[in-house]
């Protein structure tokens, strides 16, 4: 869920709240990672470069800070000891973690029909801090995504609540 406040069509403070989860098993089936359904929040601001035009159209740069606390487990971890010719599997269950990250983004929104618009965002995000556990590190962070990628692209379809009855001046 995203809420944006349009301030003079130039600055747009924004809050994102959501839930994320993950399940991942590599091709060699050496383990299964399960991120439990967990909340995340992001808070930031966008600057609209088309502030002199219709508010339904935006080209913007933004910055956000995100936080999530989450649980995960890693099961069926396969190991092979070649020296002793031993192999087996074990689980790492009940792992808890949290993370803080920052994002820089560029985006575009266009009006499709009435109060419905669509757009995309490309963002660079970086972890500032995350809790590592004694036996594992989180692979997936809700709201951030996989830890091994700093770039992301999203596509959005939005509905604008008509809270203000004033019309934008026509030229």
Predicted segments with their positions:
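Gram-negative (and chloroplast) outer-membrane scaffold detector with strong preference
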Residues: 11, 15-83, 159
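Short, solvent-exposed loop/edge-beta patches enriched in aromatic
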Residues: 5-11
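A contiguous pocket-lining binding segment that forms or flanks enzyme active sites
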Residues: 84-111
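Transmembrane beta-barrel domains of outer membrane proteins
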Residues: 2-4, 46-48, 107-109, 158-160
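Residues that define the transmembrane beta-barrel architecture of outer-membrane proteins
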Residues: 1, 35-41, 57, 96-102, ...
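Extracellular loop and loop/strand-boundary signature of outer-membrane beta-barrel proteins
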Residues: 26-34, 88-94, 140-145
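Short secondary-structure capping/turn segments at boundaries of alpha-helices and beta-strands
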Residues: 1-4, 29-31
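Predominantly the C-terminal beta-signal and adjacent terminal strand-loop region
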Residues: 104, 110-171
């Amino acid at each position: 869920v995203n809420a944006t406040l349009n301030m003079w069509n130039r600055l747009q403070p924004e809050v994102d709240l959501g839930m994320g989860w993950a399940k991942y098993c590599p091709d060699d089936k050496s383990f299964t990672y399960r991120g439990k359904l967990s909340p995340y929040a992001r808070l930031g601001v966008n600057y609209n470069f088309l502030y002199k035009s219709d508010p339904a159209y935006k080209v913007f740069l933004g910055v956000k800070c995100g936080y999530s606390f989450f649980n995960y487990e890693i099961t069926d971890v396969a190991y092979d000891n070649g020296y002793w010719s031993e192999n087996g599997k074990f689980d790492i269950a009940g792992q808890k973690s949290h993370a803080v990250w920052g994002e820089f983004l560029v985006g575009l929104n266009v009006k499709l029909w009435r109060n419905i618009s669509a757009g995309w965002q490309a963002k660079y995000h970086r972890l500032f801090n995350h809790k590592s556990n004694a036996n594992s590190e989180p692979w997936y962070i809700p709201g951030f995504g996989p830890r091994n990628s700093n770039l992301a692209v999203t596509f959005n379809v939005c509905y604008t609540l008509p809270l203000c009855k004033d019309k934008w001046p026509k030229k």
